[in-house]
């Protein structure tokens, strides 16, 4: 058994906010696997099998405690199933990565993400994988707390849908083949618009072309 935890806040008003991108990933994982959600303590959970049949047994988790106390939902499940840190993947939003970036990280500090902060505090260790999905820092003068609870703009939705699709593939690869394979495949993901290439330099004129000086 492995756990894939999508971080977010419960309630319709939070469903399409930046902070809930982790929920979008686990919801899509559940949909593709044909699973159904049920209540289990402080979480909604969905048991699925990922990968080639018979597949890897995975419990998808959506904490129902609100973001800042996510560990309250995660710790009992880790304890009940007697899981270690490497069997847990947390899918989270990441303020410090530009929107369009997706990457795995093993362990380390919470980086200001309060759901991760609480999971670390309740588990008593930080050595578990995270799948970090960039949402960018807010525009100058805007409070980060307000930014993470803001809804996606219409012009961001195409990139968001692709990030979620890639996040699903990344989480499934982690579950089936492990962190190293998933990092190698997905840590270069960058969906940011690329600047246009500079115009090519004009080719040098051939000898004897019009305008050349002649002997």
Curated annotation (Swiss-Prot):
The record marks 9 as: Discriminates between blocked and unblocked aminoacyl-tRNA. The record marks 93 as: Stabilizes the basic form of H active site to accept a proton. It is found in: Cytoplasm. TRNA binds at residues 14, 66, 68, 114. Residues 185-215 are annotated as: Disordered. Residues 193-202 have a biased composition (Pro residues). One of its GO terms (biological process) is protein quality control for misfolded or incompletely synthesized proteins. One of its GO terms (cellular component) is cytoplasm. SUPFAM superfamilies: Peptidyl-tRNA hydrolase-like. Keywords: Cytoplasm, Hydrolase, RNA-binding, tRNA-binding. The active site is at residue 19. Disulfide bonds: none annotated. Residues 203-215 have a biased composition (Low complexity). One of its GO terms (molecular function) is peptidyl-tRNA hydrolase activity. PROSITE patterns: PEPT_TRNA_HYDROL_1. InterPro entries: Pept_tRNA_hydro (IPR001328), Pept_tRNA_hydro_CS (IPR018171), Pept_tRNA_hydro_sf (IPR036416). It catalyses: an N-acyl-L-alpha-aminoacyl-tRNA + H2O = an N-acyl-L-amino acid + a tRNA + H(+). Belongs to the PTH family. Hydrolyzes ribosome-free peptidyl-tRNAs (with 1 or more amino acids incorporated), which drop off the ribosome during protein synthesis, or as a result of ribosome stalling. Catalyzes the release of premature peptidyl moieties from peptidyl-tRNA molecules trapped in stalled 50S ribosomal subunits, and thus maintains levels of free tRNAs and 50S ribosomes. Monomer. This is Peptidyl-tRNA hydrolase.
């Amino acid at each position: 058994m492995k756990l894939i935890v999508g971080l977010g806040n419960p309630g319709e008003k939070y469903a399409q906010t930046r902070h809930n991108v982790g929920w979008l990933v686990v919801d899509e994982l559940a949909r593709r696997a044909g699973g159904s959600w049920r209540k289990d303590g402080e979480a909604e959970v969905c048991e699925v099998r990922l990968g080639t049949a018979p597949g890897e047994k995975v419990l998808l988790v959506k904490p129902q405690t609100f973001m800042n106390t996510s560990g309250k939902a995660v710790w009992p499940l880790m304890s009940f199933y007697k899981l270690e840190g490497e069997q847990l993947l947390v899918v989270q939003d990441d303020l410090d990565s530009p929107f369009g970036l997706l990457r795995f990280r093993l362990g380390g500090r919470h980086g200001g993400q309060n759901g991760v902060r609480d999971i670390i505090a309740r588990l008593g260790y930080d050595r578990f994988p995270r799948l970090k999905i960039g949402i960018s820092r807010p525009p100058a003068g805007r409070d980060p707390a307000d930014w993470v609870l803001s809804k996606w703009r219409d012009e961001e939705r195409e990139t968001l849908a692709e990030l979620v699709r890639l996040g699903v593939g990344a989480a499934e690869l982690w579950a089936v083949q492990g962190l190293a394979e998933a990092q190698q495949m997905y840590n270069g993901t960058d969906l940011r618009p690329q600047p246009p290439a500079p115009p090519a330099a004009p080719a040098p004129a051939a000898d004897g072309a019009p305008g050349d000086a002649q002997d």
